Amino acid sequence: MMDTEKDDLPSATDHSEHESCDIPKTGGTTSKTASNSKDPSRPRRKKARRACFACQRAHLTCGDERPCQRCIKRGLQDACHDGVRKKAKYLHDAPDGALVPGAQGNFYNQANGLSKMSPSDFTPNGTNNIQQPKTSSIYASSTPSYNSNSTFDASSATNPSLPDSAALNPGPFTATPASPTFSISASSAMPALTQPANEMTTGAGQNSFGAFFDPSDPALFNFDLASMNFGNRYGALEFGMLGHMATGAGDTPPSDSGNQRGGSIGQRSNSQQFGNPTGAFTTESPNQQSFMFGDPVLNDWSGAQNTNPRMSVGGTLYGQGGGMHLLQQDAPHAYAIGSNTFASPSSTTSPHATTIAPSNFDDSPMKTKTVISTPHLRQQSLYNANVNKRRHREPSQIYDSVKEPYSYTGGFHKLIAFIKRRFSPPKTVRIAKALASIRPSFIATTKTLNQDDLIFMEKCFQRTLWEYEDFINACGTPTIVCRRTGEVAAVGKEFSILTGWKKEVLLGKEPNLNVNTGGGTNPSSQTDSAASSIRGGAGRMRNPEPITTNTAPVFLAELLDDDSVIEFYEDFARLAFGDSRGSVMNTCKLLKYKTKEDMDLVKSDDGRWNSHIVGKGGIVGEAGMNRLGFRDGRVECSYCWTVKRDVFDIPMLIVMNFLPHI
């Protein structure tokens, strides 16, 4: 009798009464070997995910079952429930039920029940009542229970059914207390493909003065909580919301969006949110518009670049032909980053179709352009553009397309011929000495390479350039990438804005008609006769006609003035086969792209370009960046460049970043 009472008492060396129960007994006595807590052969108990309230207060090991064994042994099985853990500071406003592990499996299992509904559950008149399933009793105290009936009234529907595309989105189609009733009016002119999905859409008619999102409807933001590895539903919601805010942010709203937002409260009930590849809502009625998340502000930014002709850099707007008409103060901001550039506050677009007339640009050859701003058409064109871009950005095409090595010998011959035409003999000698110092290294590294090695070298170049193009598009700094011969291989749009050189001209896709060589302080004198002393003395101004009109990549020496070219090649001779991770920081003067027509335009300017910049105290937008150095044809910059080598330790490409002096 004494042994039994002694066994019921917890031992000082045991951590819980469960552990004492697991110790084997022989003849009423406890084995000393099994009672040793440090014995490796002693059976270990699996830790519970969450202890009950009684075990938590007693600091004892609990189990996953409810009621647990200790509470059953003590007669507390009726009061055995999960203990409450201390919340983190950022979770103080979260309900207790949302923090229970595995809550996503119980909160959002209604979708499975809805997908099993038979067609008979829908009434013939186009209406159906969907009752939200009851949740588990564990959330009864934290989640308010409600029974909402969502009425879908489709006037053009005859026999609606659950679309097959609904399986693509596991989100629930249940109603929420914030929006109990929805009335969707479908147009007969809409395609039949989108009609079934529109009839099943819910949650779009929320009041604009309510919460920004409904926490009980995660499908509103197109992410599945069950697929996220989070221990609680609240953390998954927070993570998904942050991701939505990061990817769906928009720029300054258009000026007329205030009226749209006020009048769009009744238009939010006809939006399709499921099965949409772009995340934007489509339009179901010709008299109503659909907006991304019920707000026209977030819907306008995605197509701002396509609908705004001022965002074009390579066109005639930022070419020198229409340079005098860039004084508009509503020009877009400079250095806009990304493929879908946000619209500036002044470059607004109306929700209706607008026409850009060429009257604002008197001498510009821009034609009248109709801007289509219908939401579903704009979103479809954006989706097609993204698909085509992803198809084009396939690195495997590089290895299939490169069949021949690049002729660097011909490139160096063209470079030497250009240097002899443009520079005076003393400057030509300095550049030739710099190139001659690295010529033996080039010969030594390439003499053992065969045809396959040269083809592989070109594939490495194209593959590296493929990666650098992504960095150039993501970086707002004027950037160019050149081969070791100095031929331009890639260029960012910011560089085109700054210098006026179109991307097509730099890459050799269009003829080079530049006449600006930076020879004098007044570039208008450079349009004189091309026979004026091309091979003259060092002190004479050298102003040739356009060097070539054929389509060939532009050399880096054509983009810099004389002194900057000499300094670059002297630095390149030291860095080409020197420090593999070294870089050079220096100042230079970039030459603006100017044709003969631009030179005539500068003559009649009378200094208004530079005086306008000084008077304003800076630059405004892309037009202001384009005005830098317009009169003298040179832009003072600070630039940093480095040399990237290939697998044969040969200089492969030159990456250069420029920042103008304002």
From Swiss-Prot:
Gene3D superfamilies in alphabetical order: Zn(2)-C6 fungal-type DNA-binding domain
Name listed for the protein in its UniProt record:
Transcription activator of gluconeogenesis TSTA_069700
Q: Spell out the subcellular localization from the entry.
A: Nucleus
Q: What is its main location?
A: nucleus
**SUPFAM superfamilies reported for this sequence:** Zn2/Cys6 DNA-binding domain (SSF57701)
What keywords are annotated for this sequence in UniProt?
Activator, DNA-binding, Gluconeogenesis, Metal-binding, Nucleus, Transcription, Transcription regulation, Zinc
Q: Where is the stretch described as Disordered?
A: 1-46, 112-180, 247-287, 343-365, 514-546
Task: Extract one GO BP annotation from the record.
Answer: gluconeogenesis
Give the source species.
Answer: Talaromyces stipitatus (strain ATCC 10500 / CBS 375.48 / QM 6759 / NRRL 1006)
